[in-house]
């Protein structure tokens, strides 16, 4: 393993005028870079730092970032989550990381956990660039016709890894109408100057407002670990979740090499949903089933074995 340099604070702009912030974990030499996205309503502090350090020690410059309205990043209302916008902001993160002298622009990967895994799938599906050039085009660039576009080497992302991704964010059917009613009430109130309406991120029994189920002790555990997670999410977050389906995008990830890491007994982000998404993905792709593991308990015990499989995938696909 290589010696570790200290992480440092960074910030980057987005096309829609927001400043996002994160931590850069620089490798000791020029080489691949990877952007790591946290789970739903989670700051970069949750799990991601340990993963970044692990890959940093193996010569990958890593960027952990706070999505809009979370943690240190700008954006109002706070805890107002939009998967489509988060995917767009990942594009801006790629652009920012590509300018770092430690990063080979032909070897940039995406890594996402849970909801971050969903957004990573979407961003990888949409990451194209004209004429096979990774990041640049002349000012006021105009394509005279589709015949002039060369798409042979058109993906900016060299590889992607999606870990325990949340695939279906719509929740239980019986929760649909109440969420929509609250969302319309909230919209009308905000037009009159009211503050945004919030719901708990996780209830005491581990349930989520749209009916999904998380561990009942999740929030107390995060608090004990000192991870600053706000236990609230805007009603509009769940409205947007009803309109979002990453399954419509995953077939477009190819030809970007993709790895899906799926816990065998994932209840929070059901294993069957992850496998359904994987089936729709084109080649090249690899599936790593974490035998006997649930949504997050893979981070305890044999995590080195799991991450080494991911490192092997990245080395083979990005040639480093």
Swiss-Prot record:
Induction: The fujikurins gene cluster is specifically expressed during rice infection. It comes from the Eukaryota. GO terms for molecular function: transferase activity. Keywords: Transferase. Its EC number is 2.3.-.-. It is an enzyme of class 2 (transferase). Residues 58-298 are annotated as: Abhydrolase domain. It holds the Pfam family Abhydrolase_6. InterPro entries: AB_hydrolase_1, AB_hydrolase_fold, Polyketide_trans_af380. Polyketide transferase; part of the gene cluster that mediates the biosynthesis of fujikurins A-D, secondary metabolites playing a role during rice infection. The polyketide synthase PKS19 acts with the trans-enoyl reductase FFUJ_12240 and the polyketide transferase FFUJ_12241 to produce fujikurins, however, the biosynthesis pathway has not been identified yet. Belongs to the polyketide transferase af380 family. This is Polyketide transferase FFUJ_12241.
């Amino acid at each position: 393993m290589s010696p570790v340099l200290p992480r440092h604070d960074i910030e980057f702009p987005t096309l829609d005028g927001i400043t996002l912030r994160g931590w850069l974990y620089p490798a000791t030499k020029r080489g691949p870079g990877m952007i790591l996205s946290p789970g739903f309503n989670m700051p970069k502090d949750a799990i991601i730092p340990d993963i970044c350090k692990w890959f940093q020690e193996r010569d990958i410059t890593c960027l952990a970032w706070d999505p809009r309205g979370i943690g240190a990043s700008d954006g109002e209302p706070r805890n107002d989550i939009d998967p489509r916008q988060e995917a767009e902001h990942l594009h801006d993160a790629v652009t920012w990381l590509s300018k770092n002298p430690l990063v080979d622009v032909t070897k940039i990967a995406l890594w996402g956990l849970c909801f971050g895994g969903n957004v990573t799938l979407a961003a990888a599906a949409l990451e194209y660039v004209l004429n096979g050039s990774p990041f640049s085009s002349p000012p006021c660039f105009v394509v005279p016709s589709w015949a002039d576009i060369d798409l042979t080497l058109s993906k900016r992302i060299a590889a992607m890894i999606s870990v325990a991704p949340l695939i279906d964010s719509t929740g239980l059917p019986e929760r649909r109408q109440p969420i929509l009613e609250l969302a319309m009430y909230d919209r009308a109130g905000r037009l009159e100057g009211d503050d945004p309406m919030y719901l708990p991120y996780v209830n005491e029994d581990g349930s989520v407002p749209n009916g999904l189920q998380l561990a009942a002790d999740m929030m107390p555990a995060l608090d004990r670990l000192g991870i600053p997670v706000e236990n609230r999410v805007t009603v509009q977050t769940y409205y947007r979740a009803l309109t979002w389906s990453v399954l419509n995008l995953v077939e477009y990830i190819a030809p970007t090499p993709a790895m899906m890491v799926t816990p065998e007994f994932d209840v929070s982000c059901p294993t069957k949903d992850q496998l359904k998404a994987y089936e729709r993905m084109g080649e090249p792709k690899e599936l790593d089933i974490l035998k006997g593991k649930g949504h997050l308990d893979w981070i305890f015990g044999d995590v080195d074995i799991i991450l080494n499989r991911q490192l092997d995938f990245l080395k083979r696909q990005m040639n480093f």
